[in-house]
């Protein structure tokens, strides 16, 4: 059996929740992209309204009005978050000018975070996923966030999960 070399890391998917601690995981993505001459696809997923919430709002506003409001505002929200991601990226480059990288794409989706990350891995044909870990609740969710756990379990590509300082 011959040992193959580690594949190049040319396409990195950086999944972010845009929290204050997101910069820590992003620095790893920047460093890897810089070192291997790769690019970064940024992904932020907005969790969709629960089925209970959807039913409640529909019962109050009516189905047609609720669909109309969602359609009108959904793109505005996605565009605003995309702008926030661009600013986040520019700020990081200013803070670490010695570590330039290429931004391949900025993607904002609505849905289940783990599912959308896994879909984006396939769509972007990335070589590596970088994301932060921050569980909530019971022992910090057994030391890893539920989204990162689900992505690790099901992802076909390597996943680098960055523990946040003090976590």
PLM feature segments, named:
Residues 43, 105-109, 160:
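General small-molecule cofactor/ligand-binding pocket signal
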Residues 52-54, 118-119, 142:
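Short, well-ordered secondary-structure micro-motifs
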Residues 64-79, 103:
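Short glycine/proline- and acidic residue-enriched helix-loop micro-motifs
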Residues 128-150, 164:
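Glycine-rich, Arg-bearing micro-motifs that act as flexible, cationic patches
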Residues 157-165:
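Short, flexible loop segments at boundaries between secondary-structure elements
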């Amino acid at each position: 059996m011959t040992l193959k070399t580690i594949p190049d890391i040319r396409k990195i998917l950086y999944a972010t929740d845009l929290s204050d601690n997101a910069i820590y995981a992003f620095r790893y993505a920047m460093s890897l992209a810089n070192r291997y001459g790769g690019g970064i696809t940024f992904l932020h997923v907005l969790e969709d309204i629960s089925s209970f919430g959807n039913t409640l709002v529909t019962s109050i506003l009516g189905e047609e009005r609720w669909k109309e409001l969602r359609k009108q505002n959904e793109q505005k929200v996605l565009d605003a978050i995309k702008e926030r991601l661009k600013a986040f990226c520019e700020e990081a480059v200013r803070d670490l000018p010695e570590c330039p990288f290429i931004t391949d794409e900025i993607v904002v989706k609505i849905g289940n975070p783990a599912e959308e990350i896994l879909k984006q891995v396939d769509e972007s044909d990335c070589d590596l996923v970088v994301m932060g870990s921050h569980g909530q609740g019971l022992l910090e969710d057994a030391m890893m966030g539920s989204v990162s756990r689900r992505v690790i379990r099901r992802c076909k590509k390597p996943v680098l999960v960055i523990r946040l300082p003090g976590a």
